[in-house]
Amino acid sequence: MITEIRHIIFSNDELKLVFQSVPLEGFDPARRITRIQVVEGPPPSIRIQSEAGGGRAELEVESYQLARLMVAYCREKKIPLPKDALKTIHAQGDALCFSIMSTLG
């Protein structure tokens, strides 16, 4: 049996693009993201600080939401992801590592 493991690293800047391009309940993508903080887990989460019209807001995004957003973002960017693969997320400094493990053959 052969196992393939891939790691997709989402930098802090790329995470901003994720939240501006993939819909997330409770977050308006038109808001200007001022800060993204990766909170180490387990499981990891993200705190988004944003502002619009003079008002500031902070939103905590849990790991199950992050996984859904990352899969949607990869689809949008045409990054292939096997459906049946094991997918995990972990913090890597101020970035997130999206790991995909699948069994081949």
Task: Please describe what each predicted stretch is.
Residues 1-105:
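Intrinsically disordered, low-complexity linear regions
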